[in-house]
UniProtKB/Swiss-Prot annotation:
It is found in: Cell inner membrane. It holds the Pfam family Virul_fac_BrkB. Belongs to the UPF0761 family. The chain crosses the membrane at residues 43-63, 100-120, 135-155, 181-201, 213-233, 245-265. This is UPF0761 membrane protein VC_2742.
Length: 297
């Protein structure tokens, strides 16, 4: 009994030390400031990124209608409230890019690359990565994300459409299972995306257990924030009263900021789990790993 009590007390102290270290680490890394910076970059790069992704999808006959399906799915499940307004605006913006020249198209591609590059830099900063990737390797990785990413998404959409068309779904039991699968699909996709982000982006080895736990926390926070944000927008429509038809702009900015805040918090959790030697309730708790060289200069 004494052993059990001692073990529980030890684990509670360890958890408290981790939580204190995590808060100090996030404050040190200015997570809230970096989330705002990434939100700003995302809003500037959103249309270029969508244009590049949809143009890649449209080049394959198999994925001819995948673009619209992806837009509907993302808006419905990942952008709470004001979804139709945001969708209409994005479709208009993307449609206007069809009138651009080759130089304009190149600019869109560069803007999309810049977004991925900034995500890469911020996450590597959280993991205190000292050695940067070579430029050729980084560009190859960004290119792979922009090309293979849409193809994989399009393939999954095509597979889902094929499964939906099967007659076996007329069975009531199978139909219930399929509906349950669709209900949990957004959470599963978010979780898998966070795991991949925390495992693959940092230029150092990340333990998969840490990445899975950090991704789980981020995915749960993301789902809770979706419901909470949607409830706030519908119950307290102050943005609509103040901004009127332009209400979608601040709503979208706040939502993108929340998304990046959650991504960075999950990254901080994942990185902190690998720094157990710093979990201490002493004054040395803030002994962080050294900053990247470019941050020292």
């Amino acid at each position: 009994m004494k052993l059990t009590h001692s073990f529980i007390k030890q684990q509670a102290r360890l958890g408290l030390n981790f939580f204190r270290y995590l808060l100090a680490r996030m404050n040190h890394d200015r997570v809230n400031v970096n989330a705002g910076y990434l939100a700003y970059i995302t809003l500037l790069s959103m249309v270029p990124m969508l244009t590049v992704l949809l143009s890649i999808l449209s080049s394959f006959a198999l994925f001819a209608n995948a673009g619209e399906v992806i837009q509907d799915f993302v808006i419905t499940h990942f952008v709470p409230a004001a979804g139709e307004v945001v969708k209409t605006a994005l479709i208009e913006f993307v449609a206007n890019t069809g009138k651009m020249t080759a130089v304009g198209g190149a600019f869109l591609f560069v803007a999309a690359i810049m977004l991925i590059s900034n995500i890469d830099k911020n996450l590597n900063y959280i993991w205190r990565v000292q050695q940067k990737r070579r430029a050729v390797f980084s560009f190859s990785m960004y290119w792979m994300i922009l090309t293979l990413g849409p193809i994989l998404v399009g393939a999954s959409i095509a597979a889902t459409s094929y499964i939906t068309s099967l007659k076996i779904l007329d069975n009531e039991a199978l139909s219930g299972v399929y509906n349950l699968f669709l209900r949990w699909l957004p959470f599963v996709l978010s979780y898998c995306a966070f795991v991949g982000l925390y495992l693959l982006v940092p230029n150092k080895k990340v333990h998969w257990q840490h990445a899975m736990l950090g991704a789980l926390i981020a995915a749960i926070l993301f789902e809770l924030s979706k419901k909470g944000f949607a409830a706030y927008i519908t119950q307290f429509p102050s943005y609509q009263l103040i901004y009127g038809a332009l209400a979608a702009i601040p709503i979208l900015f706040v939502w993108v900021y929340l998304c990046w805040l959650i991504v960075l918090v999950g990254a901080e959790v994942t990185a902190a789990l690998g720094e157990r030697e710093h979990w201490s309730d002493s004054q040395d708790m803030l002994h962080f790993a050294p900053l990247p060289k470019n941050e020292k200069e």
